[in-house]
């Protein structure tokens, strides 16, 4: 289907639930005597890069030196990332297949581990823009392509300028570098993706906060499998309802609130007003008065 809209999507903590470098650290440093110390340093360097105290390129170089990755680490990394795709992305695989020509993955991560994940959703290889490793003859990572704009500050903005997409551009991501695309005037809207992580400075600059891909598709009338986003359905669980039930509801994308004890009739009357699903145990009494207050209960 021909569509005059383009979707620019981040990878780490957006397409996947995790940061790939965090997973890579557990793999490449698994038997390293300085594993915990190096992981702490990597986090510190990442934060320094994010707050601007060091350049993104310096952050990348220093983290790779600490990680000391090689080709042999890529296969287990890819396997773990494959199992860490965001739940709402998994639910909407048809969207990626239907609009493959219009979807771009733009990431400051590395193509070697991004491509195997996103191409399984139908995303085209040529629409994946990311950094690329450089290897020595033994397969050890010795650096990255420094000519790639994504290895430096403002890389995503530079890539969007080069693409010069002929239509409306919608950016979906969790990070400040995603917001920068909109700030530079290269996107019509920026959607702060909060399914996995929430960053206040990113949310402040967003046109819309989207807790799931379902919400984004609903807002833009692109729904393929869900007619109404589950994140808009409020669920209230009282009296320490079993954690498995909580996990399953959250995995499905519902907006879940929990309370450890039972509620009085008055408390429940106030709390239930915007609740669609109520989970209780024996101590909570759902009276006629409570039901009168439940204007959204299914």
What feature does the model see in each segment?
Residues 99-101, 187-188, 294-298:
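A short helix->loop->beta-strand "cap" motif at the edges of active sites that frequently abuts
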Residues 107-108, 168-211:
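Acidic, Mg2+-coordinating phosphoryl-transfer loop and its flanking beta/alpha structural elements
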Residues 2-132:
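Alpha-helical substrate-recognition element adjacent to the catalytic core
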Residues 228-298:
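An N-terminal-biased, well-structured beta-alpha scaffold segment characteristic
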Residues 151-179:
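Conserved Lys-Pro-Asp/Glu-containing loop-to-beta segment of HAD-superfamily phosphomonoesterases
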Residues 122-150:
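Histidine/lysine/aspartate-rich catalytic loop segments that bind and position anionic ligands
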């Amino acid at each position: 289907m021909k569509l005059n809209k383009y979707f620019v999507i981040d990878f780490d903590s957006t397409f996947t639930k995790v940061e790939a470098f965090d997973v890579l650290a557990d793999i490449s440093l698994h038997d390293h005597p300085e594993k915990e110390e190096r992981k702490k340093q990597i986090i510190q360097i990442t934060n320094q890069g994010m707050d601007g105290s060091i350049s993104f390129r310096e952050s990348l170089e220093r983290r790779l030196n600490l990680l000391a990755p090689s080709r042999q680490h890529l296969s287990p990394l890819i396997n773990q990332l494959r199992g860490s795709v965001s739940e709402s992305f998994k639910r909407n695989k048809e969207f990626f297949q239907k609009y493959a020509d219009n979807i771009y993955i733009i990431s400051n991560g590395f193509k070697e581990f991004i491509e195997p994940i996103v191409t399984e959703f139908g995303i085209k290889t040529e629409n994946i823009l990311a950094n690329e490793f450089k290897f020595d003859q033994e397969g050890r990572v010795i650096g990255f392509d420094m000519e790639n704009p994504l290895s430096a500050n403002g890389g995503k903005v530079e890539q969007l300028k080069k693409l010069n997409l002929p239509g409306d551009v919608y950016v979906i991501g969790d990070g400040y570098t995603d917001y920068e695309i909109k700030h530079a005037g290269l996107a019509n809207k920026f959607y702060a993706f909060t399914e996995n992580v929430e960053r206040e400075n990113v949310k402040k600059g967003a046109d819309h906060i989207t807790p799931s891909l379902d919400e984004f598709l609903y807002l833009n009338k692109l729904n393929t499998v869900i007619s109404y986003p589950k994140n808009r359905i409020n669920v209230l669980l009282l009296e320490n309802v079993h954690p498995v039930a909580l996990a399953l509801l959250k995995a499905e994308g519902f907006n879940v609130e929990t309370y450890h004890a039972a509620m009085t009739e008055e408390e429940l009357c106030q709390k239930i007003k915007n609740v669609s699903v109520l989970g209780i145990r024996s101590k909570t009494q759902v009276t006629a008065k409570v039901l009168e207050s439940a204007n959204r209960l299914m």
